[in-house]
Curated annotation (Swiss-Prot):
Protein species of origin: Yersinia pestis
Molecular function GO terms recorded: double-stranded DNA binding
Pfam families xref list: RdgC
S-S bonds: none
Job description of the protein: May be involved in recombination.
Underlying gene: rdgC
Lineage of the species this protein comes from: Bacteria, Pseudomonadati, Pseudomonadota, Gammaproteobacteria, Enterobacterales
GO CC field: bacterial nucleoid; cytoplasm
Keywords: Cytoplasm, DNA recombination
Location relative to the cell: Cytoplasm, Nucleoid
Protein family (similarity comment): Belongs to the RdgC family.
One of the GO biological process terms: regulation of DNA recombination
Protein name: Recombination-associated protein RdgC
Domain of life: Bacteria
Primary location: cytoplasm
PANTHER family: RECOMBINATION-ASSOCIATED PROTEIN RDGC
Length: 303
C-alpha cells in the first residue's frame, strides 16, 4: 500500500453519486496507454494496486482510491538546439542564403519529430482518494497544478466533477500565527521545529526555520514585526506528522511506526488483504486528522 505523502483537499460542491462500478467503466475509456513514437506526453488511469489487479478503482467502506499515470518524453533543450543549429547551417550552406524565421520554425518541428522516437520517458503516478462518506476528494500531490491536472482527467472521465478546494472560515496564516504567538495549540496538536514566516508586504522577507524552537523570543520578534506564519510543522496525536501550509495543503505526511505496524500480523504475501487493511487504516486516520484540523482552524467556510 502506498501511504500518502501529501494531501491537497477538495470539497464536492454538490451531491454527486460516485459509484465504483460506474466509475470503473468511465475510467476504462481513459486508461493509460504509453506514448507513441510522436507523443510528447500521455496520461491515463492505471490500477491503484499495480500489477496485482486490473481494476482501475478500489473501494473499501465508501472510500475509493484511483491512480493516474503520466508518461513524458524527455528532450533536453541543448540537444534540440544543437540538432537544429546543425540543420540550419547545413541548409544555409547548401542554398547560399539565410533561412527565414518561418523556415527555422518548421525545421524545429522536424527536429522534434526526428528526436522523439529516441527520447527517454519519465513516468509519475498520482493517487487520488475519494471519501464518499464526507464528500471530500484528496490528491497525493505536492503542487496544486499536479492535483488540478489529475482532477481534470477525472472530470473528463466522469463527464463532470463539481469540486472546489476546501476553504476555511478564517485565513489559515492568521490562525497559525496566533498559535505560535500565544504558544497555545488546539488539543491533539503539538508544535514541531519547522516553520516559514512571510512579511505581509509582497516584497517583504521570508524566513524558513528548521530545528528551531518556535516559541523562542527570536520568532516572537518576527511576529511582532508583522510577519505571518505561512507553513508550520505539526504533530497530531503522536500518530501523524505534517507540514501545514496557508493554502490548506498538507505536505510531508509521516505516519508513526506504531500506526504503520498495526497490520504487521497480515502476511505481506497476501497483497490484497494487506492493501485493504492499510488503506482502511490510512483513510480513517487521515479523515480524523482532516476533521480535527478543520475544527482547529475555525471551521469550513459556509458558501
Amino acid at each position: 500500500m502506498l501511504w500518502f505523502k501529501n494531501l491537497m483537499v477538495y470539497r464536492l460542491s454538490r451531491e454527486v453519486s460516485l459509484s465504483a462500478d460506474e466509475m470503473e467503466k468511465q475510467l476504462s475509456a481513459f486508461s493509460f496507454t504509453p506514448c507513441g513514437s510522436q507523443d510528447m506526453a500521455k496520461t491515463g488511469w492505471v490500477s491503484p494496486m499495480g500489477s496485482h489487479s486490473d481494476a482501475l478503482t478500489h473501494t473499501v467502506n465508501g472510500q475509493i482510491v484511483i491512480c493516474a499515470r503520466k508518461e513524458e518524453k524527455i528532450l533536453p533543450s541543448p540537444v534540440i538546439k544543437q540538432e537544429l543549429q546543425d540543420k540550419i547551417e547545413r541548409l544555409e550552406g547548401e542554398q547560399h542564403r539565410k533561412l527565414k524565421k518561418t523556415e527555422k520554425d518548421s525545421l524545429k518541428d522536424e527536429v522534434l519529430h526526428s528526436l522523439l522516437p529516441r527520447a527517454f520517458s519519465r513516468f509519475n503516478q498520482t493517487f487520488l482518494w475519494i471519501d464518499t462518506v464526507n464528500d471530500l476528494i484528496m490528491v497525493d500531490a505536492a503542487s496544486a497544478k499536479r492535483a488540478e491536472d489529475t482532477l481534470a482527467l477525472l472530470r473528463k472521465s466522469l463527464g463532470s466533477l463539481p469540486v472546489v478546494p476546501l476553504t476555511l472560515e478564517n485565513p489559515i496564516e492568521l490562525t497559525l500565527t496566533e498559535w505560535v504567538r500565544s504558544k497555545t495549540l488546539p488539543a491533539g496538536f503539538a508544535l514541531m521545529d519547522e516553520a516559514e514566516l512571510k512579511a505581509i508586504l509582497e516584497d517583504g522577507g521570508v524566513i524558513r526555520c528548521k530545528k528551531q524552537d518556535l516559541f523562542s523570543d527570536e520568532i516572537a520578534v518576527h511576529i511582532e514585526a508583522g510577519k505571518l506564519v505561512t507553513k508550520l510543522a505539526l504533530d497530531w496525536q503522536e500518530r501523524i506528522q505534517l507540514v501545514l501550509s496557508d493554502d490548506g495543503s498538507l505536505k510531508r505526511l509521516k505516519f508513526a511506526d506504531t500506526l504503520r505496524d498495526q497490520n504487521e500480523d497480515i502476511d505481506r504475501e497476501d497483497f490484497a488483504q494487506r492493501f485493504d487493511a492499510d488503506f482502511i487504516l490510512m483513510t480513517s486516520e487521515l479523515a480524523a486528522l482532516i476533521k480535527n484540523l478543520i475544527e482547529a482552524l475555525g471551521g469550513e467556510a459556509q458558501h
